[in-house]
Curated annotation (Swiss-Prot):
It comes from Salmonella arizonae (strain ATCC BAA-731 / CDC346-86 / RSK2980). This is Glucose-6-phosphate isomerase. Its main location: cytoplasm. Belongs to the GPI family. GO terms for cellular component: cytosol.
Amino acid sequence: MKNINPTQTSAWQALQKHYDEMKDVTIAELFAKDSDRFAKFSATFDDLMLVDFSKNRITEETLAKLQDLAKETDLAGAIKSMFSGEKINRTEDRAVLHVALRNRSNTPIIVDDKDVMPEVNAVLEKMKTFSEAIISGQWKGYTGKAITDVVNIGIGGSDLGPFMVTEALRPYKNHLNMHFVSNVDGTHIAEVLKKVNPETTLFLVASKTFTTQETMTNAHSARDWFLKTAGDEKHVAKHFAALSTNAKAVGEFGIDTANMFEFWDWVGGRYSLWSAIGLSIILSVGFDNFVELLSGAHAMDKHFSTTPAEKNLPVLLALIGIWYNNFFGAETEAILPYDQYMHRFAAYFQQGNMESNGKYVDRNGNAVDYQTGPIIWGEPGTNGQHAFYQLIHQGTKMVPCDFIAPAITHNPLSDHHQKLLSNFFAQTEALAFGKSREVVEQEYRDQGKDPAQLEHVVPFKVFEGNRPTNSILLREITPYSLGALIALYEHKIFTQGAILNIFTFDQWGVELGKQLANRILPELGDDKAISSHDSSTNGLINRYKAWRA
């Protein structure tokens, strides 16, 4: 990958000038000028996904200039570097190959002169065999009973991805009850343990190093809870499996290393649901559905790696995001899925985007003088409409939004889905076109009211509109289409990081807090007053000690 400061390119300068021409142009004006706007600014993927980006403050000239930026920063070269196994995560000297985990074509992918696909396929086969034994009931716990509950213990990428996917694919789930524990707050695991029986529960401990503080604290608490009933430590092997590479620590914990599922240092945590970390997904929906998830992602990988940038969906969405973040000063993006099963999708890509591109140092080691990653947030519709949409519609901040919905619901109950989708369509229309003062006044006249007598209310009912949105309409949320959708967002994040000249696949920002926590933890072991920190931290620790006494 080349290290090119995007602001030093001629394309960036052209975009800055173009922004001056576009900043006062409205979405309504763009639609009024072009009756074919939807056709020009939308695209389908495999007849399973329609991406409509027409309700954005862009023209064909805007996209052409953004494409020039992608060319000048050598996006095509960056894509090739990732897919070929180059060590593009230079700060950790690692390749970035989550695409290999779902490489259903099985073509060789080389890292350090070695094809990784045989090992990828071997772990998949091992997960298949293990999961089928659990799901079928062939695997028995220490009292001879089949497993009924699975508890995934992990944090970050070892939790967010599997939890999001198992929830999104709940219509496909089998009889096993799935639980997820991540927070080191003892309340989290305590509440889960209240719901399960030690005789019929399988724990998955997801930690590559088997040293992650939160995960191992929860794992040891689960083990202690289990042994209070089971007694003999040999029974741990029937109720615990590991998603890890540290065979020594796994064995010392009491887990049979035959039930240790490995992954590799070229798998980043927030891109790991496709790996052994996805074992909880397999146990929830079955191996065949997991393969469909991989296949959908692989189809999007092929689209991303082979489609010209002008028609490349992840690239288009990434460029539009850069346009708002760096030229319009938008600081956030909202992800708004109109599907209750997708209720963790925004949280998943909050990590996916903010941990990837929340960087202030470029690939040359210099502080940037432009915007990198946006703040990502969101909730399912229609809940969000009754919470934060007020600010999106009438607030002072620009919040570009992605609206996501399936055309076909898994629960065709009465007219629920039509009502849900009517809101989905209405919101993007309202955000784009708003409601003028003239329309508000005419509505009053139609109601037999005199607008002049309601002058004090009229300004508050005006919607400026011109709020940008993308609409992603899926035919149906299936394992395949979900895989494609997740990969779409992954590649959008990669594209933005490549163009913005930052390292997307490290996360040094999480380290300092952990280091300080390790220093503070021993200081909390007694009741002595602390004076080794700043006055604020000292004051907080000392009040904590006083109150817990």
